[in-house]
């Protein structure tokens, strides 16, 4: 009986030990899932998101241990912010102006409430304001858009709000132009056919559709500069100066303009240590190599501009890393 009791005690102990070991192993191996909302698969956000997701995932020795990051295609800035707010995404890419409006409840988010938990993880690269004009339209400045047929992009887009800000700085409203509200693709086709004089587009240069227009029809880019640009920069923290270099588009001269920024945002509810570790891996040498080799815009993602265009607060975890790295005081 004693021998049997001893066997039973050993068996119970062994089972308990196995359960404990299994539980500790499960805890050690439990993955943390971290989704990055991007944009359409044909755009820039999606491939950049894929590069970053691969870099920060903890599959090897170079990522965040236990982290499983994935790039998720989406409808872009507004959709990503709304999904972060609802908890459907842990993070996402957005234009800096859209992030600013969401956080402050203005612009596109006027009357929709503030997204007060929105936090910045990193500013990535500039997204340039293009005012694309027909070469024969004789549009030399924004003021020359008066009375012209101009597409401002669709209602609900970030571009249309940017366009209105630019027009206002030059003393114009939509009533002063023959405004149309087309996506960039249809706007380019209308311009090509002579049914449109100019259109606004926000994105990195060179972009394929505008390059094709420059080759097939000839275009000019309308500058945004001088006191009007300074007025915009003073009023809106999410804008910065930019220049489209000569040759970015066929036979188009260097053009001063403004830009917003592509930003990686998350929620204040994400753990500080997690965001700290993600930010740290984002800026290590291996991620640098992956970004440089993986996409043209990857080369523009730099640590020294990671905290620029601060229209919303940094996540505390990201802020801790940037202070350690000397980017923030």
Swiss-Prot record:
Cleavable signal peptide: 1-28
What keywords tag this UniProt record?
Signal
Domain of life (superkingdom):
Bacteria
Do you know which InterPro entries this protein is assigned to? TRAP_TAXI (IPR011852)
What SUPFAM superfamilies does the entry give?
Answer: Periplasmic binding protein-like II
Q: Which Pfam families does the annotation name?
A: NMT1_3 (PF16868)
Q: What else is known?
A: Brucella abortus is the causative agent for brucellosis in cattle and man.
Q: What is this protein called?
A: 31 kDa immunogenic protein
Query: Which species is listed as the source?
Result: Brucella melitensis biotype 1 (strain ATCC 23456 / CCUG 17765 / NCTC 10094 / 16M)
């Amino acid at each position: 009986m004693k021998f049997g009791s001893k066997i039973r005690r050993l068996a119970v102990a062994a089972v308990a030990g196995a359960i404990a070991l299994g539980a500790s192993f499960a805890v050690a191996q439990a993955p943390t899932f971290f989704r990055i909302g991007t944009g359409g698969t044909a755009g820039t956000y999606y491939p950049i998101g894929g590069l970053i997701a691969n870099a920060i995932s903890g599959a090897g020795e170079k990522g965040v241990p236990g982290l499983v990051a994935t790039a998720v295609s989406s409808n872009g800035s507004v959709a990503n912010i709304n999904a972060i707010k609802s908890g459907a995404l842990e993070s996402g890419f957005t234009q800096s102006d859209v992030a600013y409006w969401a956080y402050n409840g203005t612009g596109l988010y006027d009357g929709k409430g503030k997204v007060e938990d929105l936090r910045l993880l990193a500013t990535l690269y500039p997204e340039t304001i293009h005012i694309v004009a027909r070469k024969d339209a004789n549009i030399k400045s924004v003021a020359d858009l008066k009375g012209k047929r101009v597409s401002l992009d669709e209602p609900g887009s970030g571009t249309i709000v940017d366009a209105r800000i630019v027009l206002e700085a030059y003393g114009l409203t939509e009533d002063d132009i023959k405004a149309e509200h087309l996506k960039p693709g249809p706007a380019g086709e209308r311009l090509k056919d002579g049914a449109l004089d100019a259109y606004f587009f926000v994105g990195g240069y060179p972009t394929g559709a505008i390059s094709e227009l420059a080759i097939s029809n000839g275009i000019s880019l309308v500058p945004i500069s001088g006191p009007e640009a300074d007025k915009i920069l003073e009023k809106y923290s999410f804008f910065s100066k930019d220049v489209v270099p000569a040759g970015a588009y066929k036979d188009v001269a260097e053009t001063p303009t403004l830009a917003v920024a592509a930003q990686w945002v998350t929620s204040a509810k994400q753990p500080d240590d997690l965001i700290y570790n993600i930010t740290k891996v984002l800026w290590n040498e291996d991620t640098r190599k992956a970004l440089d080799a993986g996409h043209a815009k990857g080369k523009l993602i730099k640590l020294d501009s990671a905290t620029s265009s601060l229209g919303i607060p940094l996540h505390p975890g990201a802020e801790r890393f940037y202070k350690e790295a000397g980017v923030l005081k």
